C-alpha cells in the first residue's frame, strides 16, 4: 500500500486532493490515517483532520503544516 500512498502524496502536491482522499480512505493503516488527516487539513476541515490524526496515533500539528507533513509522510514511507 505504500506505493499507493506515495502516489497520493504526488496527487496532493499537484492539487488533486480528491484523488488523494480516495486512496487514503481505502488505507486503514496508521500511515493511511495520517495521510487522510493531511487531506482534511488541505480541505480546511479541522475536525476531520484532528479525528484522522488521532486514528493515526499522531499529535495534530495545526492547519498550517501541510508541506511539512507531506515531507514527513514521504520520509516515513521511504524509511
What do the PLM-derived regions correspond to, one by one?
Residues 5, 12, 17, 24-25, ...:
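Inward-facing hydrophobic residues that define packing positions of alpha-helical scaffold repeats
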